[in-house]
Amino acid sequence: MRLLLIALVPLFLCSCGGYELKNLVKSDIDLVTDQFITKTREDVSELVVMLYKRNPEQLAKNPGMTIEGRLAQLKVHRYRLQFLELEYNQGTDAMNLAFSPSFTGDRVFALVVGLGSMLRQAYAYQPEMFLPDQLEAEVLLTSAQNVEMLVWKLKNTR
């Protein structure tokens, strides 16, 4: 009887609306982190659209490229964002390309690849978190400070 009950509990939990079996191996913090990861990726996508609408000449540096194409490039790489056109730079290195006077490529793409890869690194390149996963507070703090500096640079650089 006890074995039958153990076998049926996951079945009943899975039949509950919105509950996924994988959530059995997630803490409350993991669920909150998953929501934050999803939200930051959505925000970066919105930023891509906004920056390309304000700077269409950057998108035009790659003939035939569209905003949707750039978004697809960011989404197809689930973990590390590495692109030849940015010489495989990530994080702050890619973001600094966007502000470098000698860089002739797509500055918007460099900026969002840098931002996106930095945020992914902060979450240990995990698209979602589970019980054994751990976040490093120092890496999260550094990425938050880098985002603050990026916002300042965007406001004060023309």
Whereabouts are the PLM-identified features?
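Sec-dependent signal peptide recognition
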Residues: 1-7
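C-terminal motif of bacterial Sec signal peptides marking the signal peptidase cleavage site
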Residues: 12-15
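N-terminal Sec/ER secretory leader and immediately downstream segment
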Residues: 17-110
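Mature extracytoplasmic/lumenal regions of exported proteins
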Residues: 91-158
